[in-house]
A protein has these predicted regions:
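Short, well-ordered beta-strand elements within core beta-sheets of diverse protein domains
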Residues: 43-48, 219-221, 228-233, 291-292, ...
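Glycine-rich, histidine-containing beta strand-loop boundary motifs that form or position
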Residues: 69-73, 80, 91, 110, ...
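N-terminal flexible segment immediately upstream of the FAD-binding catalytic core
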Residues: 1-58, 74-104, 264-273, 325-346, ...
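FAD-binding subdomain of flavoenzyme oxidoreductases
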Residues: 96-100, 106-110, 114-249
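Generic structural signal for well-ordered, non-membrane alpha-helical segments
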Residues: 2-6, 46, 50-53, 110, ...
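C-terminal substrate-recognition/cap domain of FAD-linked oxidoreductases
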Residues: 21-29, 241-406
Length: 406
């Protein structure tokens, strides 16, 4: 890394927040994307404000050096792995949280994790109801740039549906504010779709290519305290997918509905069954694990009764293993990471969204590929938003076996 560039970065953020030490660079060469090779950056800089990010990008432009924004480093598809010799802009110092209780919104800096935000909001009886399954380490801003989904998405959709506005530093170093906060006279974030086009949406799911998000404004809701957990079994995938559609058609307040094949559930139970307190179960060909929640207990009871009725009308039955959805929900901040690494192997993953009638065909193709090449893997998924099913196939490999990895 050019010493002149390093000196200019130090002038912006302070010497203690710039590093070219080999051990530090090695740390930032990887992320949670274990199935991908790391690349060593030339320097890491840790700004403490949006204005510092802007000045850093101006310097990067001057020296024509590639920039990789990074916060929690929990991305699963190599988004946070830097360019060789490039500059990592690490955003974890941006820790501000501002609540706008009357506007039912909150603004968080790019270094705030979902776990930190949830702890803060819990003190006010509030929450953001959509989480990734790595929330103790995943930052809100990092999840926004991949348009993440997870527990809560069956009811509320992806994290994009929670976003009210963004503070973004463009590659040129220009700072912009989207949503209602773009009006300097606005009391705070209360409207995403202000006059004109949806500029906010340009940056959601952009993987940081169009600018660096330094703060995110989100909707908040009154925290739910009443839940129903249950599992529903079906003989065909058509019955299972129809069950989820009918729950949505009947406005059942399903926060999270996961789909499992019987063989996949057995695989998961080897990893988490004992911890969740789930006894040996003969799982049906298809299981839907359901979390129903509401601020009112009577609505939860009514919705749970209707879910059972719909299940039986479709030819299914109630499995009565509430420990599975309860474990998924109560452990939602860290389930994914623990389950994925339980076997000590590395894995590659590819999230994809499908219509209710299309997902099964994709699963069949995935299984054919796994069988053809003798690979260990699985796929499961959950309903997201209005009519989308989100599936995430995993392919496991032994990191010590280069032939297996290849």
């Amino acid at each position: 890394m050019d010493p002149k560039l390093v000196k200019e970065l130090e002038d912006i953020v302070g010497e203690e927040y710039v590093s070219t030490r080999p051990d530090v660079l090695l740390t930032y060469s990887h992320s949670a994307s274990t199935g991908y090779d790391g690349r060593i950056p030339g320097a890491v800089v840790r700004p403490g404000s949006t204005e510092e990010v802007a000045e850093i990008l101006k310097v990067a432009n001057k020296y024509k050096i590639p920039v990789t924004p990074r916060s929690g480093g929990t991305s699963l598809q190599a988004e946070a792995i830097p360019e060789e010799g490039g500059l990592v802009v690490e955003l974890l110092r941006l820790k501000e949280i501002t609540l706008f209780e009357d506007l039912r919104s909150v603004r968080v800096g790019a270094g705030v994790t979902f776990g930190q935000l949830d702890k803060f909001l819990n003190q006010h009886g509030l929450w953001v109801p959509v989480y990734p399954e790595s929330s103790l380490a995943c930052t809100v801003a990092g999840n926004v740039v991949v348009n993440g989904a997870g527990p809560g998405s069956t009811k509320y959709g992806s994290i994009a549906e929670m976003v009210m506005g963004l503070t973004v530093v463009l590659p040129t170093g220009e700072i912009i504010q989207t949503g209602s906060e773009g009006n300097p006279n606005a009391p705070g974030p209360f409207l995403r779709y202000s006059f004109g086009p949806d500029i906010t949406g340009l940056f959601i799911g952009s993987l940081g290519m169009f600018g660096i998000i330094t703060s995110v404004s989100l909707k908040v809701y009154k925290r739910m305290k009443h839940f129903d957990y249950n599992t529903y079994g079906f003989q065909t995938h058509e019955q299972a997918q129809r069950f989820v559609i009918e729950m949505k058609n009947n406005e059942i307040n399903v926060l999270f509905a996961s789909f499992y094949e019987g063989q996949i559930l057995q695989f998961f139970m080897e990893m988490l069954g004992e911890e969740y307190g789930i006894s040996k179960t003969d799982w049906p060909p298809y299981t839907v694990s359901v979390v129903i929640g509401h601020v009112r207990e009577d609505i939860v009871r009514s919705d749970a009764a209707l879910a059972r009725e719909l299940c039986e009308k479709l030819g299914g039955y109630v499995i009565n293993v509430p420990e599975l959805p309860r474990g998924e929900w109560e452990d939602r901040f860290r389930t994914f990471a623990r389950a994925s690494y339980a076997h000590g192997w590395h894995w590659r993953i590819l999230y994809h969204h499908h219509t209710p009638s299309h997902w099964r065909r994709v699963i069949d193709v995935i299984w054919e590929g796994l069988d053809k090449f003798g690979l260990l893997g699985h796929t499961a998924g959950f309903a997201t938003g209005h009519a989308s099913f989100n599936f995430y196939p995993h392919i496991y490999f032994d990191p010590a076996d280069k032939e297996d990895e290849g």
